[in-house]
């Protein structure tokens, strides 16, 4: 775990920061789609500005694969979601169906219900591994600068959560492909 800050965050926000160690990456995590040229250039521009402000800027990235991030969402979120939905359905008398849940939510529920406790335990092991990899990475830097999205913002409707025929693996991959740099932080717990 990281140590508590020496001063409150509010106090820190009112003063110029000390010289920061800022890692940056324009390369998507292994297995993820390549970031769009506009997104990569924005990172390079921001890195250059940080360097001009006196920070120590260097290229670097944690060794977390895109599949690790996707698998956590798929194999941890789905069974947790299934348990929560079952509880709410029991309390409300509603059932899981198209009138209450989008197609991709139903696909995640099906995936979660089909998992064994052993599979969930293995997925939680991936959460721990991702957390440790990120922790090691941040011992060498204070900030990691990346694109938020792998491409410019998508038009409304491209990520259609009610798309029939999309299974849990496909849906999670589709979502994580949009923001592959952020996915690992959600996957770390």
Task: List the model feature ranges, each with a label.
Residues 1, 71, 76, 122, ...:
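Short, surface-exposed loop/helix-turn segments at secondary-structure junctions
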Residues 2-8, 124-132, 174-176:
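Short gly/ser/thr-rich secondary-structure transition/capping motifs
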Residues 11-27, 76-135, 147-151, 156-160:
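Short helix-loop capping/hinge segments that flank enzyme active sites or metal/cofactor-binding pockets
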Residues 30-32, 66-67, 152-155:
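Flexible loop/turn segments at secondary-structure boundaries
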Residues 35-62, 85-96, 120-141:
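Acyltransferase
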Residues 184-185:
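Conserved short alpha-helical elements in the N-terminal third of ANL/AMP-binding
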């Amino acid at each position: 775990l990281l140590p508590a800050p020496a001063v409150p965050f509010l106090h820190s926000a009112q003063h110029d920061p000390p010289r920061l160690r800022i890692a940056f990456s324009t390369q998507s995590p292994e297995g993820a789609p390549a970031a769009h040229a506009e997104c990569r250039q924005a990172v390079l521009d921001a890195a250059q500005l940080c360097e001009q402000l006196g920070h120590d800027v260097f290229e670097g990235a944690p060794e977390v694969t895109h599949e690790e991030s996707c698998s956590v969402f798929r194999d941890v979120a789905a069974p947790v979601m299934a348990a929560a939905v079952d509880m709410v359905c029991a309390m409300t008398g509603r059932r899981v169906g198209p009138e209450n849940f989008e197609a991709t939510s139903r696909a995640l529920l099906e995936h979660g219900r089909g998992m064994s406790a052993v599979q969930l335990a293995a997925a939680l092991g991936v959460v721990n591994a991702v957390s440790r990899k990120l922790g090691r990475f941040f011992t060498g830097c204070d900030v990691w600068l990346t694109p938020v999205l792998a491409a410019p913002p998508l038009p409304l409707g491209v990520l259609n959560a009610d798309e029939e025929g999309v299974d849990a693996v496909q849906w999670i991959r589709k979502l994580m492909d949009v923001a592959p740099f952020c996915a690992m932080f959600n996957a770390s717990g």
